[in-house]
Amino acid sequence: MPKTKFIIYKYSFLKEENLFTKKNDTKEEAINKALETFSSLFESKSLDVYQSKKDGTPCKYSNQIERTLDGVTYLRICDHIERTRVKDFKETLEDTEPFCAVVVDTRAGYEQIAIERKSDVFRGETDKIRNLLQDAFNRVLIRYGFKIAIKRKIKVTDFWHTVHEQVHKNKDTIRKIIIDFPDPDKNINLDTSPVMLDSLKLYSSIAKLTNANDCQILLSTTKDKTLTLQRAENDVTHIVDLCCRYGYNISVYFRQMGVYRSKEKMNACYWMEDDILTDFVNKNWLIMVRAIHLSSYGG
């Protein structure tokens, strides 16, 4: 069954002191008021989403609220693109509005937004959609003394768990693996077997002889095949363990997911199947258990 990748964001409310805010409101009362105001935005047929052009005129982005169920709203938002077409030796500008899906979860304890990543919508940059929505929400919320901050969720990952989940659960394939090999002389505490240590010294020696800044090994395959990366293989497991423990890098290039590096934190994402809204509600966002929100990340 076809799946679509969504990037997960977490939102929170900030109380702004102004004429519309009661200063004696408790924190709980303020948050409840913010949630009530925010939820009411999705009772209409669309949101007021726009961005000012360089000349100051607004560029509006078409959107449509498709459905709301149990505090979860599914909407679609369009990009605005001008393309040049040539016909009969004449160039004409043509407007096109590719769209992507957005799911907003206002349920207590969830407070998150999922944005579909499509390469032809805002060039696949979901943060641009986040910024547009954040501005649209704040134009309304600020009247009631609130602002909303929407930030990416960061997924806490284990290397082998991530690879296994992507290959077996998401049916992804691996087209390339790049492993950075360290100079063993720079890390006297490198805990590895004599055979592995000799191999690392050989790679380091070749790098020095060729005046290379670093040493890597590249593993790749053809378009119709996939590389195998399994924990059962002792030598492979040992190499991955070295990379993870000592801060060296192993990069796995998936065909769908893109590159996953052992040293990097991952953005929380979710692969949705056909019925987007039902899938969202029924699966109850189990990914939430494996994700954390960093207040210093995103913006």
Regions inferred by a protein language model and the residue ranges of each:
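Long, hydrophobic/aromatic-enriched structural stretches that serve as scaffold segments
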Residues: Q64-V121
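Terminal interaction module
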Residues: M1-H80, D120-G299
